[in-house]
Amino acid sequence: MFLTMMKGKIHRATVTEANLNYVGSITIDEELLDASGILPNEKVQVVNINNGARLETYTIPGPRGSGIISLNGAAARLCQIGDKVIIIAYALMEEKEAKQWQPKVVFVDEYNKIVKIKEKEIHGQTE
């Protein structure tokens, strides 16, 4: 049996662009993609902390070190510049692997610069 497990997460990123006239996707600073283990073109869930909206899209790498988090296409209707979002990728794995799995959780500051990287989440802690 395969389980769907959190693979990587970028926590409380700030939306820097919302481009309605783009084909689709979310553009993410390549440094954040690498740190979180999320790949270009990978399916992600985006959770908007400001309004509770949840959406699925795919990633496009943005310029390394730029801090870009851009919701593109229809997703731009669900996020505004300045909104805080959580970006999550999932992976399918066998139960045996899932029990040992440690996802990458990337915490960023208000400029989307990496503050800390953890391999697990603890209830009640935002960092």
Curated annotation (Swiss-Prot):
Gene Ontology biological process terms in this record: alanine biosynthetic process; pantothenate biosynthetic process
Name recorded for this polypeptide: Aspartate 1-decarboxylase
EC number: 4.1.1.11
InterPro entries on file: Asp_de-COase-like_dom_sf, Asp_decarbox
Entry keyword Translocase: no
Source organism (scientific name): Carboxydothermus hydrogenoformans (strain ATCC BAA-161 / DSM 6008 / Z-2901)
Keywords from the named record: Autocatalytic cleavage, Cytoplasm, Decarboxylase, Lyase, Pantothenate biosynthesis, Pyruvate, Schiff base, Zymogen
Binding site for substrate: 57, 73-75
Subunit: Heterooctamer of four alpha and four beta subunits.
Reaction it catalyzes: L-aspartate + H(+) = beta-alanine + CO2
Residue ranges the record marks as coiled coil: none
HAMAP family for this protein: PanD (MF_00446)
Family the entry assigns: Belongs to the PanD family.
Positions bearing Pyruvic acid (Ser): 25
Reported cofactor(s): pyruvate
Any one annotated GO CC term: cytosol
Highest taxon above the source species: Bacteria
PTM entry text: Is synthesized initially as an inactive proenzyme, which is activated by self-cleavage at a specific serine bond to produce a beta-subunit with a hydroxyl group at its C-terminus and an alpha-subunit with a pyruvoyl group at its N-terminus.
One Pfam family named in its UniProt record: Asp_decarbox
Residues the record marks as active site: 25, 58
Function, as annotated: Catalyzes the pyruvoyl-dependent decarboxylation of aspartate to produce beta-alanine.
EC category name: lyase
Subcellular location, principal: cytoplasm
Cofactor binding description: Binds 1 pyruvoyl group covalently per subunit.
Molecular function, one GO term: aspartate 1-decarboxylase activity
Cellular compartment(s): Cytoplasm
